[in-house]
Each structure stands twice: as C-alpha cells, then as structure tokens.
Amino acid sequence: MKKELNFWKMLKIQPDIYRIFFVFIFLIFSTNELKAEIKKPNPDIKPREVIEIQLNALMKNDTPSKDHGIIQTWFFAHPNNQRVTGPIERFKNMIKTDSYSMLLNHENYEIVEVYKSKGVSTFEVTIMDKDKKYYKFKWQVEKYELDGFLKNCWLTTAVSQPMPMGSSI
C-alpha cells in the first residue's frame, strides 16, 4: 500500500514530466497518422488511377493538413519530373502560381485517355475550378523501368500549361 501511495505522490510532484511525455507520444502518433494518409506508388496502380489520386488530393489540398494535396501529387511525380520541378518547396510554389493554381481545390474533373503505348499513357484532363471556370490539360504518365522501389510504377512525367475553356455560368 505504501508503494502505491508513493507512486501517486510522485505523479503529483512531477506533473510536467508526464505532460511532456504524453505530448511527445501524441506527436509521434499524429505524425505517423499523417504519413499513413499519403498514398505511395506501386505497380498495381494503373495510369488513370495515378491521375485520379493526384486530382482527388489537389481537390482538397489542405485536408488533412496544409498542402497535403500538393505533397501527394509530388509522390506520384516521376523522378525526372521531380528533378526539374523540385525540391518539394519549389514544387509547392510552382503549383500555387497562376499557371497551375486552378488545380487547387477544384470542383470536379474529367479524364479521357488519348494515347496509350506499352510504357506511356497520355490523357486529356478537364477541370472545373472553384470559380466555375474550365481548363484543359495534357497529362502524361510513364512506367518507371529502372530498378528500385519505383520499378514498374506509373508516374507523372508531364502536365501541360492549362488551356482555358470558359465558364460554366
């Protein structure tokens, strides 16, 4: 009984240590939860699905955290694309420019395949942005052929500048 009292007494004496401990544990689990929400490339994901993953993420860019959609999109960018558009902070800034900002928090999209070969697929993507304006893009994905964790994964190699298509109003 005396040992049990000492334990509770110790908790009262050192509450700050325990608060710090619980905050630390909470942060660890929160960080892992955010990481778990990022979809990673794998060979089972088809070309169209790559674009759907990217567009769905950009549609809700700041959910569950700031720029989550842009980060998700980055994960499916081909390494050659990342070399040109990265690092990630530069990629975030590029997406937020007038050239691509209409992708952020857009209302809906349509994807039409226009070309397919063994290792390359090209799609015409039409989005309606949050201001009800339509834009069309050419979106190209390629199968990554080099050894490593991305082998046989479909990844985005190019997204054209948008072509304004007018308003829905």
Language-model region placement:
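Bacterial N-terminal signal peptides that target proteins for export
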Residues: 3-21
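Sec/Tat signal peptide C-region and signal peptidase I cleavage site
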Residues: 32-36
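N-terminal low-complexity, Pro/Thr/Ser-rich intrinsically disordered segments
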Residues: 37-49
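Short, aromatic-enriched amphipathic alpha-helices that serve as compact interaction elements
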Residues: 46-62, 72, 76
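Low-complexity, polar-biased intrinsically disordered regions enriched in Pro/Ser/Thr/Gly
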Residues: 60-66, 147-148
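Short solvent-exposed beta->alpha transition segments
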Residues: 64-119
